[in-house]
Every structure is written in C-alpha cells, then in structure tokens.
Amino acid sequence: MAVTSVLTGSAVTFRLLKHAVAGPVQFVNLPLSMAMVAGYLAGPASGFTVGLASFILSDMLLGLGVWTIYDALASALVGMAWGYLRGVECGATLFTLSYLSALAYDLATSVAFYSTFMGAASPLTVLTVAVTGLFVPVAGGSLYAVGPVTEALTALLTSVVVRRVRQVVGEAA
C-alpha cells in the first residue's frame, strides 16, 4: 500500500511540475513510468492502481476529458502487466520492455482518441493517423518524432528507477 501511495503521489506531482515547466508538451510519460515501476516492485494490483489513479488525479487538476479514460485505463493495464515481469533483471531487457510497453500504450491511446474524434472514419484510416501522429504532426501539433522520444525517455526513466530501487532494496536486505 505504501509503495502504491508514494508512486501515485510522485506520478501526479511530477506530471503537474512537468506541465508547469513545459506545458502540455509530452516528452516523458511520468504516470505510465510510475505505473510500470509499481507493477514491477509491488505487483499487478499496485501497477493497475498507480496507472489508473495517477491519470485521474492529475487530470482533475489539469483538465478532465474523454482522454482521461483512455490514458488511465491503458496505463493501468500496462502497470498491471508489469506485475508479471518481476523476474526480469537485465537492464537492456528492462529498457526494451519499457519501450515496447510505452509504444503499446501510445498506440492504444492514439487509436482510441482518434476513433472518438474522427467520426465515421474507417478503422484503417484511424490506425494510419494514430501511427503517423507518433512521428509527424497530424492534428494541429508542431512536434516531430514526439512518440519515439517520449517512449525512449519513459523507458529510460523506468529502467533506471527499477534497477536503482532493486539495488537499494538489495543493499538494505
């Protein structure tokens, strides 16, 4: 319970600080990273809770919208999945799994978002726009390659935190 509370509070606080400094520009997904860390350290229920609560709580202060549902549920599911990766110790493997998890999260939330706002567009069109939007602006944005950069930085943060916490816990034992 303590790990879940601390990581949820950290995710919300750092997301709010990131928004205060950089605005809505996404360059690291802090709630998703903390959900993965929670799942890895404390199990599937903790990962799910941190993923769900961190997006809902931070969006209550930043602005709730239909995206809150997508973000919270996708982050919760990724965090829960990380509860089953506790045996993974290799840093490169942790980074790779973090990157793939962040990519899956981004694709799922982009498809859900564009499905909602593109009306009667075909599923193939929605998928094309969602994937393209990870690399080039498609809906009025101005950032290029924001998806891969966000995924890489989120994966780096997650893998470093997991390894460091494991190291500290190992030294304390």
Regions found by a protein language model. Name each.
Residues 21-25, 64-69, 84, 88-173:
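Membrane-embedded alpha-helical hairpins and interfacial helices in multi-pass inner-membrane proteins
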Residues 32-40, 80, 84, 123:
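Short amphipathic alpha-helical patches
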Residues 1-38, 45-46:
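Hydrophobic transmembrane alpha-helices
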Residues 6-14, 30, 54-58, 121-122, ...:
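Short amphipathic alpha-helical segments, especially helix-boundary/capping motifs
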Residues 1, 44-49, 88-94:
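Membrane-helix interface segments
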